[in-house]
């Protein structure tokens, strides 16, 4: 299927180094962006008239907790992934499938490996509403061998996570070996930071743990739900090069502390946005949009940069092609505009004012998944007009 998207008012790239691009049209073929420019006029199966509104990459949720299927036992909710798609989310990155009913917490090594393999294989075969669920994240526990990391890499698992590992065992050196084994195989390492989570058995981790283990991603550094102390957050920004995750489940005040440190150190490219849902915070279809609006409207992040934190920064930190609108990338994108009654001029101005915009279309791999209007946002002021070629 080919798609021509024309009359774009503002193109937000998702690239934090170049967050806006001057172009009014975009052509998609075979699920990827083939061309971006001005006045593109190519025959297409689907023509989308953006009517001068904003186009941005599909949102990449850096921190989600799927189990199996479009259902979460954490809130006994059906269809949550489909609802997130209507909130502009096109990729979900699993921070562990730890809400599986009956899962021993913490799991032993054999159980943790089995769960990661099973989740990886199941989510390779299922995409609710077309959403890409990057699952099979291994929960790191004592007792793993280097050969286990060979198996993870062979299965295509690309993320492991410290959350239940007993840090009293750090002097043994096993945790550092896990990081080295993962890195040698192209597997990213995430670390649950801050206080204890809903499970009651996650391990507390502040700056000292982060500085020792040096994960690729510091999970919910602003709290999930409780953050590390302010001085620790500042130390992690200043003293490491780890990616810094901001989640909807966390402490809003700590986001302001984090962003002050990020500005001081020019670290905007390290900030990632996630929801840390489903969980005790609930199911949040608009969670990613709300976090962008908070960063732009309260933390004074330029809105196109805040979008990059929820798209391209996340993709880059996790080694994914998704999150940036440029030639050759997956055609995952969102068309959106201000909501009727908003004082904003457009979607980016809405974010800058702390408002939510309204979504009129979502494409994943070039296929329309939401059209007309989202089920999860108010309608946009100027909905996109979609025409399909007959025959």
What are these regions (language model features)?
Residues 80-111, 120-141, 154-167, 186-190, ...:
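Divalent metal-dependent hydrolysis catalytic cores, especially in the metallo-beta-lactamase
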Residues 330-384:
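C-terminal cap of metal-dependent C-N hydrolases
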Residues 1-42:
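N-terminal metal-binding scaffold of metallo-dependent hydrolase/deaminase domains
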Residues 42, 50-114:
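Metal-associated gating/positioning segment near the N- to mid-region
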Residues 73-81, 141-152, 200-209:
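Short, acidic/polar
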Residues 157-263, 267-282, 299:
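Active-site core of metal-dependent hydrolases
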Residues 62-75, 131-145:
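Active-site mouth loops of central-metabolism enzymes
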Residues 260-339:
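His/Asp/Glu-enriched, well-ordered alpha-helical/loop segment
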């Amino acid at each position: 299927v080919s798609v021509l998207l024309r009359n774009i008012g503002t193109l937000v790239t998702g690239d934090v180094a170049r967050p806006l691009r001057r172009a009014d049209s975009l052509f998609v073929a075979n699920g990827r962006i083939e061309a971006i420019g001005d006045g593109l006029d190519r025959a297409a199966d689907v023509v989308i008239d953006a009517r001068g509104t904003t186009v941005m990459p599909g949102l990449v949720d850096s921190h989600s907790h799927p189990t199996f299927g479009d259902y979460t036992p954490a809130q006994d909710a059906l269809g949550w992934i489909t609802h997130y798609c209507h909130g502009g989310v096109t990729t979900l990155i699993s921070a562990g499938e730890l809400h599986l009913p009956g899962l021993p917490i913490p799991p032993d090594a054999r159980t943790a490996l089995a769960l990661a393999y099973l989740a990886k294989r199941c989510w390779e075969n299922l995409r609710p509403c077309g959403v890409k669920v990057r699952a099979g994240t291994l929960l790191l526990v004592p007792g793993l061998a280097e050969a286990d990391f060979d198996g993870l890499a062979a299965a295509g698992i690309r993320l492991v996570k410290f959350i239940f590992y007993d840090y009293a065992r750090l002097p043994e050196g096993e945790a550092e070996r896990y990081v080295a084994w993962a890195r040698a195989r192209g597997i990213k390492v995430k670390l649950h930071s801050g206080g204890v989570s809903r499970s009651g058995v996650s391990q507390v981790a502040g700056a000292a743990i982060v500085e020792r283990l040096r994960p690729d991603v510091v999970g919910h550094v602003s709290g999930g739900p409780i953050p590390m102390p302010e001085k620790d957050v500042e130390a992690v920004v200043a003293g490491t090069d780890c990616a810094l995750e901001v989640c909807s489940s966390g402490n809003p005040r700590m986001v302001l502390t984090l962003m002050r440190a990020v500005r001081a150190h020019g670290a905007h490219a390290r900030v990632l946005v996630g929801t840390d849902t489903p969980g005790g915070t609930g199911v949040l279809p608009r969670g990613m949009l709300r976090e962008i609006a908070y960063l732009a409207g309260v933390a004074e992040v330029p809105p196109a940069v805040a979008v990059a934190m929820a798209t391209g920064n996340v993709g880059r930190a996790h080694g994914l092609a998704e999150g940036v609108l440029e030639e050759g990338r997956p055609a995952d994108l969102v068309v959106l505009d201000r909501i009727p009654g908003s004082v904003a001029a457009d979607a980016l101005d809405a974010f800058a004012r702390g408002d939510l915009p309204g979504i009129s279309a979502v494409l994943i791999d070039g296929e329309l998944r939401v059209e007309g209007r989202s089920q999860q946002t108010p309608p946009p002021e100027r909905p996109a007009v979609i025409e399909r070629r007959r025959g």
